[in-house]
């Protein structure tokens, strides 16, 4: 919300500067985002009156003006503005003045005629975008006065970021009420008075939807001057609040909205037919709004209508057919209370965001309407003349919201604030907040004022007491805690270390919902029975996840839909598995990879990621555990490709899964490239085996390569385990460096090349000893797997 500091200080003027005022509001919970100057920096501009305006002899569009500046001889000014005329009061930039830009005004000669200054438009002063003519000032403006002083331009615009619960502060009066409260100053709201009725013309109002609109006030105002102009002081206040002037009728309604927080609307009376109805729209009914957009209404939308048509989207925006214009002389002024629950969301449905809907959605004081319509009437009559008819009020008192009393306990204040306030100070704060207070022994019964929609609980009252007392005034009490250093076990692998490793390998951490859709859960494991939520947020978040893959797949889909086709993500969190009738929470690490193995670059050609790329990432994670008993065993998982999936084992226990997403699920979810996933039990992962020291051998390594023909479906891991077991302590490492099937290898077989590295810690290995070990290895592989040396 934007408002003028000078306007605010007309209601309440504390003895603090702008910085102090900003701090007061922020500490009271009304965060001020900034305080900017109300006008651009300029100097040397005064209020001047044009005494004479004669055509320039050498230019059709120029006039030679004699201008009174309030002292000395009138100045000769050459001006090209279309509205320059004798008697007009306008800003004059004197010789030597500096305008925004910066532009320094000098004596000049225009088409042979000297000009001793420049008459200014609003745009040239940086006040408005209108450059069509001179800025017209009231005829009684003091000639010779500095324009900055006259228009109060040495002002600041406060930008206040209000939380949704503080609808009572969506007005200058509301902010002024808070400033008075903070500074213990007296405060009186705007005294609207009662406008004298000069006409008996009125319209009958029917509340056809009283639950949505329990109070509606209307007034006919006739005979307003269609040529009247909004006064400069009102235009300036509107401008500083971010609104532009649209004519007296609209400007007055906008002004009262800013001043009191009550939206109003003015209809062109001549465009209305018969009585006014506040009703639900008819399905398919059309309404062209003030912004020119035609919308199709539905029956859950509230409209203001006459006997023939919908006139306005209630509480949101008026219609084009009944809008006031430049020729309007009779208006029907509307001021109503609309129930927040029935207005909420309707503006967003039609892509609208208006000042009215912003206030009605959050709640408008249901007792404000009479004062607001009297204030608007008085301002409109003052500016444009006319006669006001009687106020027509349609109301259902039983449907108006009432503020329920709230019990406040003295003991509870101390518990929540950590501060024991005297009872009389608590009562004083509540009274200053405008609340009705009845005191009893354990505390108070407090009734909030009608404008405080956000006060419903005891905690709400205590929050108000805390912020008015001052959060910064509450004494600090640091707890006396004795800290003791505790040894950290080296056998525990920290989860942060695992996250760092994955980040180093190009993964990004994500956090997804623990609740997922039942349909997605069935895809991952159709046999599992996920725990259903009794009151889910939505149908897509109806069950508790049995795997972190559900959230990762959803995240990958969202990334792909935003043209992010290389995804490497991981998540740590709980999954919920039902076992033996009870629900278990298991801490889990899961990851998902798709797209190219490398980011696009010139130095190396990239390729699609494959199973073994992701397997190497999992091996790197498991390598942090120091466990030597890690194995990958081909196995079937409902969510994984039957030919590219493996169960991860540590010892004889299952520790997780790795594989490519099942092709059927891939198609159902719309993935157009392979998706690889892994999931690890964090409990098994985070127990680490400490490394044991062994002296380094100073004798040379010996490597022998084996090319073996084995069954095509034999896992290479089985061969590696057999080599390690049969080779004995001399075998230091075995590496798989080639797999081949095709010409030269019989059908159903494959050729596997192994590099076996041997070393003795005591002496240099001889060929005989190496041959003996290799023969033993080959014999074991032949016996266990039918392996043959490839010729």
Curated annotation (Swiss-Prot):
Cofactor requirement: Mg(2+)
Residues that bind Mg(2+): 454, 460, 463-464
Keyword Nucleotide-binding: yes
B5 domain span: 401-476
Cofactor mode of binding and number, as noted: Binds 2 magnesium ions per tetramer.
SUPFAM superfamilies in alphabetical order: Anticodon-binding domain of PheRS (SSF54991), Class II aaRS and biotin synthetases (SSF55681), Nucleic acid-binding proteins (SSF50249), PheT/TilS domain (SSF56037), Putative DNA-binding domain (SSF46955)
Listed GO MF terms: ATP binding; magnesium ion binding; phenylalanine-tRNA ligase activity; tRNA binding
Coiled-coil segments on the chain, per record: none
Alphabetically ordered keywords of this record: Aminoacyl-tRNA synthetase, ATP-binding, Cytoplasm, Ligase, Magnesium, Metal-binding, Nucleotide-binding, Protein biosynthesis, RNA-binding, tRNA-binding
Any single GO BP term: phenylalanyl-tRNA aminoacylation
E.C. no: 6.1.1.20
Record Pfam families: B3_4 (PF03483), B5 (PF03484), FDX-ACB (PF03147), tRNA_bind (PF01588), tRNA_synthFbeta (PF17759)
Catalytic activity of the protein: tRNA(Phe) + L-phenylalanine + ATP = L-phenylalanyl-tRNA(Phe) + AMP + diphosphate + H(+)
Cell compartments where the protein resides: Cytoplasm
InterPro entries: aa-tRNA-synth_II/BPL/LPL, B3/B4_tRNA-bd, DNA-bd_dom_put_sf, Fdx_antiC-bd, Fdx_antiC-bd_sf, NA-bd_OB-fold, Phe-tRNA-ligase_IIc_bsu, Phe-tRNA-ligase_IIc_bsu_bact
Keyword flag Aminoacyl-tRNA synthetase: yes
Any single GO CC term annotated in Swiss-Prot or TrEMBL for this entry: phenylalanine-tRNA ligase complex
Main enzyme class: ligase
Range of residues in the leader sequence: none
Entry similarity comment: Belongs to the phenylalanyl-tRNA synthetase beta subunit family. Type 1 subfamily.
Subunit structure: Tetramer of two alpha and two beta subunits.
Classification via PANTHER family: PHENYLALANINE--TRNA LIGASE BETA SUBUNIT, PHENYLALANYL-TRNA SYNTHETASE BETA CHAIN AND LEUCINE-RICH REPEAT-CONTAINING PROTEIN 47
Annotated HAMAP family: Phe_tRNA_synth_beta1
Protein name according to UniProt: Phenylalanine--tRNA ligase beta subunit
Organism: Methylococcus capsulatus (strain ATCC 33009 / NCIMB 11132 / Bath)
Name of the gene encoding the protein in the UniProt record: pheT
């Amino acid at each position: 919300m934007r408002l003028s500091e000078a306007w605010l200080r007309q209601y309440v003027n504390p003895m603090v500067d702008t910085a102090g005022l900003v701090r007061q509001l922020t500490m009271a919970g009304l965060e001020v985002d900034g305080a900017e100057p109300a006008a651009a920096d300029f100097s040397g501009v005064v209020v001047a009156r044009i005494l004479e305006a004669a055509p320039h002899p050498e230019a059709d569009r120029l006039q030679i003006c004699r201008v009174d500046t309030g002292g000395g001889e009138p100045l000769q000014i050459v001006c090209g503005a279309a509205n320059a005329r004798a008697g007009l009061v306008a800003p004059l930039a004197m010789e030597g003045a500096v305008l925004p830009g910066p532009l320094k005004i000098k004596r000049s000669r225009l088409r042979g005629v000297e000009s001793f200054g420049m008459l200014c438009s609003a745009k040239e002063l940086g006040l408005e975008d209108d450059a069509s003519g001179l800025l017209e000032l009231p005829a009684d403006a003091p000639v010779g006065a500095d324009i900055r002083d006259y228009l109060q331009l040495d002002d600041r615009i406060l930008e206040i970021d209000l939380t949704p619960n503080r609808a009572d502060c969506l007005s200058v009066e509301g902010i002024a009420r808070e400033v008075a409260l903070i500074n213990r100053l007296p405060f009186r709201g705007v005294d609207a008075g009662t406008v004298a009725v000069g006409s008996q013309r009125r319209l009958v109002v029917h509340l056809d939807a009283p639950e949505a609109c329990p109070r509606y006030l209307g007034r006919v105002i006739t005979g307003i001057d269609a040529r009247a102009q909004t006064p400069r002081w009102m235009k300036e206040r509107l401008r500083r609040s971010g609104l532009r002037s649209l004519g007296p009728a609209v400007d007055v309604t906008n002004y009262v909205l800013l001043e009191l927080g009550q939206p109003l609307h003015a209809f062109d009376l001549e465009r209305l037919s018969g009585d006014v109805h506040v009703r639900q729209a008819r399905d398919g009914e059309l309404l062209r709004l003030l912004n020119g957009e035609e919308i199709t209404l539905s029956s859950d939308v509230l409209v203001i209508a006459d006997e023939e048509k919908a006139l306005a989207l209630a509480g949101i925006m008026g219609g084009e057919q009944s809008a006031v214009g430049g020729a309007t002389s009779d208006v029907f002024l509307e001021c109503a209370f609309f129930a927040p629950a029935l207005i909420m969301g309707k503006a967003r449905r039609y892509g609208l965001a208006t000042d009215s809907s912003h206030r009605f959605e959050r709640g408008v004081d249901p007792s404000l309407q009479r004062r607001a319509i009297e204030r608007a009437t008085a301002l409109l009559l003052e500016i444009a003349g006319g006669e006001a008819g009687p106020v027509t009020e349609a109301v259902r008192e039983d449907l108006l919201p009432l503020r329920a009393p709230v019990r406040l306990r003295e003991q509870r204040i101390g518990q929540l604030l950590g501060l024991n306030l005297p009872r009389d100070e608590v009562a004083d704060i509540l009274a200053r907040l405008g609340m009705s207070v009845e005191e009893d022994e354990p505390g108070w019964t407090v009734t909030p004022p009608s404008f405080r929609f956000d006060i419903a609980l005891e905690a709400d009252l205590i929050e108000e007491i805390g912020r008015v007392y001052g959060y910064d005034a509450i004494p600090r009490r640091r707890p006396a805690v004795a800290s003791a250093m505790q040894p950290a076990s080296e056998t525990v692998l920290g989860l942060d270390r695992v996250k760092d490793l994955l980040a180093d390998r190009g993964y990004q951490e994500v956090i997804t919902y623990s609740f997922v859709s039942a349909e997605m859960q069935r895809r991952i494991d159709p046999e599992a029975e996920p725990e259903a939520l009794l009151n889910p947020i939505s149908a897509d978040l109806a069950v508790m996840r049995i795997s972190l893959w559900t959230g990762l797949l959803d995240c990958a889909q969202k990334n792909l839909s935003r043209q992010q086709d290389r995804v490497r993500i991981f998540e740590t969190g709980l999954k919920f598995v039902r076992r033996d009738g009870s629900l278990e929470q298991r801490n889990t690490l899961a990851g998902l990879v798709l797209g190219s193995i490398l980011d696009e670059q010139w130095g190396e050609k990239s390729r699609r990621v494959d199973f073994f790329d992701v397997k190497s990432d999992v091996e790197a994670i498991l390598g942090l555990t120091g466990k030597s008993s890690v194995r990958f065993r081909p196995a079937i998982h409902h969510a994984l490709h039957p030919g590219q999936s493996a169960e991860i084992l540590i010892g004889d226990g299952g520790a997780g899964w790795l594989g490519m997403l099942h092709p059927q699920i891939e198609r159902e979810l719309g993935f157009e490239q392979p998706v690889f996933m892994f999931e690890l039990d964090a409990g098994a992962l985070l127990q680490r085996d400490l490394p044991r020291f062994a002296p380094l051998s100073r004798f040379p390594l010996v490597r022998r390569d084996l090319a073996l023909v084995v069954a095509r479906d034999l896992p290479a891991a089985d061969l590696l385990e057999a080599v390690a077991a049969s080779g004995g302590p001399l075998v230091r490492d075995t590496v798989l460096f080639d797999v081949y099937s095709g010409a030269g290898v019989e059908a159903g077989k494959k050729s596997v090349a192994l590099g076996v590295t041997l070393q003795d810690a005591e002496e240099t290995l001889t060929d005989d000893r190496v041959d003996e070990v290799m023969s033993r290895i080959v014999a074991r592989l032949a016996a266990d797997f039918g392996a043959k040396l490839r010729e």
